[in-house]
Amino acid sequence: MGRLKQKGKAGAAKNYVTRTSAIKKLQCSLADFRRLCILKGIFPREPRSRKRANKGSSAPTSFYYAKDIAYLAHEPVLKKLREHKAFAKKLSRALGRGEWSSAKNLEENKPIYRLDHIIKERYPTFIDAVRDIDDALCMVFLFASLPTTTRLPPELMENCSRLAAEWQLYIMRSQSLRKVFLSIKGVYYQAEIMDQTVTWLVPYQFTQNIPADVDVRVMLTFLELYQTLLGFILFKLYTDAGLVYPPPLDAKKDESAAGIGAFSLQDITQPAAQPSRAKAVELDGRKISTKDVRQTIKNIEASHSTHDPDVEMSNPETATTEVEEEFISQASLSNPGLISSLPQSLSTSLFSPYTFFLSREVSRPIFEFMVRSFGGKIGWSASFGSGSPFEETDETITHVIIDRPLVGREESPSQRELRLRRKYVQPQWIVDCINSGKILLEGPYGQGKTLPPHLSPFGEYEGAYDPAAGPLGPSGVEQESESEADEVSEEDEEDQGGLVQAAVEAVTGDPVELRAAELAAEAAGVDYGTFEAKVKKLNKKQMKKPITDGVEDGEKDMNKMMMSNKQKKLYEKMKYSQKKKEIEVSKFGISLDAVLTSSIAGDTDY
């Protein structure tokens, strides 16, 4: 007969530990326990039976793995936290007694813990660290935009700003930026580092206020970990690229609001390669070179071959050449020079032939980062800060990024000539060119014009709306209209007819969705008669469906009958979401092409 198990000594009661018992076991405060869990990556678990895990109690509580708590008990950071607690008691006692010399001595020798070992434990390889850098970048860029308060010291903000600038400098140098999206929360960037996609969010440059209900202590603990992680990653990236880390900062440029231009990237100066010489080793007072070692090895092999009759005699000519052969050093696979010599794609140097100038109302840090990441040259007015490579009157400027309405004003002949030689575009043109991977036409993005929809480039699921592959064709947006105004109107009618047909095909089964398609067609400028004719035509086609469609529907119904209730609900949910996506794609196509056709008509009228 097996031994009886005592209640609460095995199973879930042994594998899980409540938060209260974990704090008692570690002998630390709740704040220190939270900090340890954040730094070590330990989070609450949900047992199958909360009552069994809590030894029969049904009180609400948080559970942790017992092995995780035992893992925390040997953490060096926990030891430093205990030392800091004792240090705080001694310091308060010395200040209370007025012992200023001892208090100063305690302050100079206060315990400080490091997180290097935690980074190595949580991220064994460099690729693991790069995969988990998204949250670190978002947190660092967030704190870099916050004002300093009593809870946020200036040193912390300066360190976050420095890390953010170093990351942007590396992205610009390596030309790793791939996608950009302007949202309400901020600017989403996506880069490709070591074949890993990294996405982060940068808030707009507005005055930020920390809400009172936000626990800053928890965020500061995360920031402490993320700063160390980002420092490790940047050091590795800069070293592999052959750059000095940290990049030197020019204090004068920084004081004059030069931004990331205050940092200078410097290549690592490698010593000149000396001619290869045979390494000499002293043995019993006599120098032995590598040639002597090779000769000794050959003699040993020759002696073995004489004793073994099965081994064939080697050619003496080849033997002499092998003895005289010198060691040839091979290039390392992680040579920093090889990384910069890799061929770059055309999209990474998208703006290299162009020179941009920022108007005063456009955000300089955002668009300077975008343009320089794709090889372009950019300048700005003196009100943005120092460091502009050229002035507004420079004749090499090809594009002016402007975000103000078009207002008529008197211009001198020289100003008019300068304006005609440049192209004035709105900021969205830069972002859409980056996401499409090519230079788009400047016409729809001209100054004062209604912009086309700015869609997220992160919708990569199958069936997502692609503006370049709409009913107008992949190159329909890029083609210039060289015909007269009447030909443009005829083409618009044909395109609108195709749009209506694409929309109606997706929604003819539901009257509510059909009404939505009718409103969308009306907004696109299609009359009701044309829309009604398309609906009737499609209904007739559906009535003349072949019998095979009915057979397929019957097979689907039979398969559905064999499903369980859970599988049926999942199948219906999947079909509903698929149909909803098709409707959204059709509506997006109608609205976008209506805007594009109106902008093309406006260009021809002009």
Swiss-Prot record:
Record keywords, A-Z: Nucleus, Ribosome biogenesis, rRNA processing
InterPro entries membership: BRCT_dom, BRCT_dom_sf, PES
GO annotation, biological process: maturation of 5.8S rRNA from tricistronic rRNA transcript (SSU-rRNA, 5.8S rRNA, LSU-rRNA); maturation of LSU-rRNA from tricistronic rRNA transcript (SSU-rRNA, 5.8S rRNA, LSU-rRNA)
Major location (coarse): nucleus
Listed name of the protein: Pescadillo homolog
Binding partners and assembly: Component of the NOP7 complex, composed of ERB1, NOP7 and YTM1. The complex is held together by ERB1, which interacts with NOP7 via its N-terminal domain and with YTM1 via a high-affinity interaction between the seven-bladed beta-propeller domains of the 2 proteins. The NOP7 complex associates with the 66S pre-ribosome.
Acidic residues bias spans: 479-496
Coiled coil: none
Region Disordered, residue ranges: 461-497
Residues in BRCT domain copies: 346-447
rRNA processing in keyword set: yes
GO cellular component, as recorded: nucleoplasm; PeBoW complex; preribosome, large subunit precursor
Organism domain of life: Eukaryota
Listed Pfam families: BRCT, Pescadillo_N
Compartments in which it is found: Nucleus, Nucleolus; Nucleus, Nucleoplasm
GO molecular function: ribonucleoprotein complex binding; RNA binding
Role played: Component of the NOP7 complex, which is required for maturation of the 25S and 5.8S ribosomal RNAs and formation of the 60S ribosome.
Family: Belongs to the pescadillo family.
